Amino acid sequence: MAKLFAISDIHGYLDEFLCALSKVDLSDKNNRLILIGDYIDNGLQSFQVISKIIELEELYSNQIITLLGNHEEWFYDWLILEKPTSSAFPETIKSFFSLEELDYILKSNPNNFETAVRDEIKNNIKFIPFINWLKKRYKDKRYYETDTQIFVHAGIDEEAGKLWKDLTSSEMFTNKFPITTGDWWIF
């Protein structure tokens, strides 16, 4: 019988992610791993976590389902859309570079470190797989559905009932607030 594994809110903690992955069995081609967002921020290895996810997607392309969370959306808005942010993702940014590289970037543009680091991520060849992954995932739907389950980072519009797919705002899928728990819907 196929198994579904789900992991959420890794937040840049690679060791903990690897520990959780050690309990996931993808040797059975029918098993699935659903990653439910917030892979970055807080921990010191956000870039390494995403790199591991990209590797898993390549190795198990039909078994890995990857959904974005609000932290990836915020990072996309900052990096790709160049929207201003209040946090500038310090731990996530540090995970892309060595201390020497960060020092060089700071010295190259001391008046606007945020722009300099954004440009370095966007223009450095070693980050192309990450950029492509982020752009592709940003276009993907924010939920995964089985016959009996809905996987989503934050929530759905519970009042919409069977019309939740059509009536849930994209914001609610990844950033639902306040947190609520509702009935279990079986369609």
Predicted regions: what they are:
Residues M1-F187:
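Feature recognizes metal-dependent phosphohydrolase scaffolds
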